[in-house]
Amino acid sequence: MPWGFFQSHFPYTIFYMKNDCPCGSAMPKFILTVEGCLRIGMVHLHSELVMPGDEPIGGGFFDVDYISNRLILYRQSHDYGVPRWHLVETLRVPKDYRGYTIKYIYDDGWHEDYNVSDSLPIEYYDDKDNN
């Protein structure tokens, strides 16, 4: 299949050809925990983002739009499924993303995009604290 097919059908997906990824095979992934903690990182597996005591309730991939200050979350984790936003009361986001609008894109043909920033109160945490 031509490369343009993937770019047009999967606009929010980052595809790397073999040996092109700057981090080996790590990808930009996130998980959501039942405590409302959004964990973000360049990892091989979503499970690498889980800290002791965490209970993941979904995950997926992310992209950062630096021009419009948006954190775009999309797709789903094979390990933890689609993020279950309805179980979260307050979202805790790494402080590096303060001021960013957060949006989750379902892209399944059934759900509308979920504007996380407008739907949940957001607190920020220092990523070094690991909580």
Question: For the regions a protein language model found, what residue spans apply to each?
Answer:
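Eukaryotic phosphoinositide-binding membrane-targeting regions
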Residues: 1-131
